[in-house]
């Protein structure tokens, strides 16, 4: 049976809860709201939780942000600070001090707009490792050494991303790795409006069926934090969501006592999803869909994520000071 594509832990848990009455066994969920941003923390506590939602044991924090194509500078700063606070909570578990090196990796293909989030973020980061090495007297002691790389993809370099990162890790020996990647979602509403942070590493391309070498503490020997935004949704998922909206609207317009209402209510969600996939697949294959404004959206999201990472990695500096280094 085809499984719905999603890289988001919060969606994986929702899918499990749709199939069972007890969705919390082995999984703890906390939700809070900061103004217009809803923050959901999913903790996969044990093997049971891992099996149920098919996500590795660890912490996954999801930020649902307002869906706007273009944010003004105040909006970007506000969202960046909230994101930085949540990222800092994950980073704190690695017990870093200001002298420890962080490697930031921008995964993805810069030639494909929805997959270019990682490389775009790298271009907006405050990188300091070279400054700490070559002009240490000109740099404040509280500034952490940060280095960054956008390794490209197998089709461009001929090398597995994991091989490239492993070689870099062996040479510069970072104390923490932060990976940024574009993800896939199972709901249209989460495309380009959700940021996920996790401390279990990442498998580049897994959301779209391109399984590459896992980047994690197990494979690299260094703690790996993954930051991602879903930028695409499967065409079958989009069709399924559209039909769900139609069904819900029809339910509201017919009497609950009618046979037609009973028929609508009896439609099995999983069977419907599978039917849509089987009908569409011969015609469109593995088609992925992204909004037409994706160029502007990627620019905005990369600013938000880069600013948030800069704030989280350089707690001794104000954002205005960070921007002097970046701009």
Swiss-Prot record:
Single GO molecular-function term?
Answer: metalloendopeptidase activity
Pfam families xref list: Peptidase_A25
Q: Which GO terms describe its biological process?
A: proteolysis; spore germination
Under catalytic activity, the entry for this protein gives: Endopeptidase action with P4 Glu or Asp, P1 preferably Glu > Asp, P1' hydrophobic and P2' Ala
Recorded hits in SUPFAM superfamilies, A to Z, give: HybD-like
User: Which positions correspond to the propeptide?
Assistant: 1-7
UniProt entry keywords in alphabetical sequence = Hydrolase, Protease, Zymogen
> Which post-translational modifications are recorded for this protein?
Autoproteolytically processed. The inactive tetrameric zymogen termed p46 autoprocesses to a smaller form termed p41, which is active only during spore germination.
Q: What is its EC number?
A: 3.4.24.78
Into which family does the record put it? Belongs to the peptidase A25 family.
Q: Assembly and partners?
A: Homotetramer.
Function, as annotated? Initiates the rapid degradation of small, acid-soluble proteins during spore germination.
| Name this protein carries in UniProt | Germination protease
Taxonomic path: Bacteria, Bacillati, Bacillota, Clostridia, Eubacteriales
Q: Gene name on record?
A: gpr
């Amino acid at each position: 049976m085809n499984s719905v594509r999603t890289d988001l832990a919060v969606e994986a848990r929702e899918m499990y809860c749709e199939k069972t009455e007890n969705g919390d066994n082995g999984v703890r969920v906390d939700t809070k709201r900061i103004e217009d941003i809803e923050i959901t923390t999913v903790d996969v506590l044990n093997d049971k939780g891992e099996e149920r939602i098919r996500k590795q044991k660890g912490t996954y924090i999801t930020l649902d942000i307002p869906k706007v194509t273009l944010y003004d500078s105040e909006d970007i700063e506000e969202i960046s600070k909230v994101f930085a606070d949540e990222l800092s909570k994950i980073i704190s578990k690695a017990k870093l001090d200001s002298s420890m090196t962080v490697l930031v990796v921008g995964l993805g293909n810069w030639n494909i707009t929805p997959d270019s989030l990682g490389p775009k973020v790298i271009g907006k980061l405050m990188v300091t490792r070279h400054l700490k090495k070559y002009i240490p007297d000109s740099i404040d002691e509280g500034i952490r050494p940060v280095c960054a790389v956008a390794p490209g993809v197998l089709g461009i370099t001929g090398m597995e991303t994991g091989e490239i990162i492993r070689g870099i890790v062996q040479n510069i020996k970072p104390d923490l790795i932060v990976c940024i990647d574009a993800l896939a979602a199972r709901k249209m509403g989460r495309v380009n409006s959700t940021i996920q942070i996790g401390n279990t590493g990442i498998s580049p391309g897994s959301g779209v069926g391109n399984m590459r070498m896992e980047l994690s503490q197990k494979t690299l020997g260094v703690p790996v934090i993954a930051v991602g935004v879903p930028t695409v949704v499967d065409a079958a998922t989009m069709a399924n969501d559209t039909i769900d909206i139609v069904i819900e609207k029809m339910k509201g317009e017919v009497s609950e006592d009618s046979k037609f209402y009973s028929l609508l209510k009896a439609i099995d969600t999983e069977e419907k999803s599978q039917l849509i996939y089987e009908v569409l697949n011969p015609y469109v294959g593995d088609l992925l869909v992204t909004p037409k404004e994706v160029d502007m959206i990627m620019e905005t999201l990369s600013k938000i994520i880069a600013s948030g990472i800069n704030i989280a990695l350089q707690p001794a500096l104000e954002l205005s000071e960070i921007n002097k280094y970046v701009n």
